[in-house]
């Protein structure tokens, strides 16, 4: 019987929304050194691969970026398209969203769970929580969902090593999302512990 990951990959491969953006994911993954499978898991959770998705809070597109966040990471309106229209374009949304995710992974090194929590709730929320996952059920469920998908999609270590190109260092992700919170932090709090020390757990419901 196929594994859960294999079944999930098979579902993705027949989903038109996914098939049409695979090349954008691959390019962004390589440019920002973010695992392809992490982008798959995050986008599946955020938008279900619907490039036209708009949240009640105003987040747009595949990676559900808030316009303010997109502006921080290089997206600008022009005479032809508004910022929101640009974010509905996978060629704009995926690179910008991946740049933001890369920033968060660097902000919380070795803590993918905190990076994902920050993607959902905002980095300020994570910092105010003492560099722990904020006590928002939605954020805790988001982190749990993205990580579960990621671990199903990620190939086993021997397969992963076989897929990696010679000489390429693949990022080792260490597992770790309040309603569209990818906004600028309103408070910057210094990291209070070593970045590789476990700071939080996600309670099971």
For the regions a language model picked out, list residue spans one by one.
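Catalytic glycan-binding domains that act on GlcNAc-containing polysaccharides
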Residues: 2-166
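An acidic, Gly/Ser/Thr/Pro-rich helix-cap/linker signature
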Residues: 1-12, 23-26, 156-205
